[in-house]
Amino acid sequence: LTEVLGTQIEAGAKAERAVLISDLHVGTDGGAVLRSLDAALAVARDSADALFVLGDLFDSYVCRAQIRVGIWREVAARFRVATDGGLRIVVLVGNRDFLLGPEFVAATGAELVTGGYRVQLGGVDTLLVHGDELCQNDLPYQKAKRWLRHPLTRLVARSMPVALARRAAEKARKKSQNVIQSGDQSRFLPSERAVATAFAVGVERLIFGHIHRHARGSFERGSYHVLPAFDQDGVGLRIDPGGWQPVRFGKGAAAATEVELPEACAWSK
């Protein structure tokens, strides 16, 4: 394993053709994002080797018992149908669902990555991360992240009853929203130094989500793609040996339609 910005990076099996999505934020009521998810699963089953979810599949996930109830069970069932049909699904944890654990793997048949993932996608050496580790200037979040992911904190949280876990998640979300609305907004952007550190492991391409801003460009001798929040417009990324193309899933008659290439990302200093 390699560590980048406190994130353990796993090496994964290559995929010549892949679908990538991020930040679905599936809430307790499901919502329209499920239609886009179903379309992405269908496209991946028909034309890809793997589906990659780059974090925040769920709006919140705290305790292991959640996978047996409500929307968490519904999404798990969708994934199980796909994996039983032969689709490889790789799910990275995000800042909202970092407490996903073995119960998720058992229910879905997916691979769970608790850090980053280095993989050959379409023949290109690629690093996949959620993206929160790149936002190093968001000091309050980075400090909270360290104790939230401490083994003791994880043990207590994952053992909670579902009702208590949901109340705790709602309280934390409200507090987070208040923090986000105050102060210098540039601190929520990836820092140039952090992005350079990610590329320093030797990859040719970096793909991440988290900041909910669709972007794409070059960085030094590599290239990057920032996935937008999937729950906002159903946009993800298709990769094959011929290149990479952003697409919108589940809108209109077609399962996937191409969208315009986004502009470059802004970095914080």
Language model features with spans:
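Core catalytic region of metal-dependent phosphoesterases/phosphodiesterases
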Residues: 2-17, 21, 26-121
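Structural motif
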Residues: 17-18, 49-50, 124-126, 205, ...
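N-terminal short leaders/motifs
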Residues: 59-82, 173-203
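Conserved beta-sheet core of the metallophosphoesterase superfamily
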Residues: 107-114, 127, 132, 137-144, ...
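A short acidic, often aromatic-flanked loop/helix-cap motif at beta-alpha or helix-coil junctions
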Residues: 118-121, 232, 254
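Active-site-proximal loop/helix segment associated with metal-binding centers of metalloenzymes
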Residues: 131-190
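A short, surface-exposed interaction/processing loop segment used at functional sites
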Residues: 248-259
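A short, charged
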Residues: 258-269
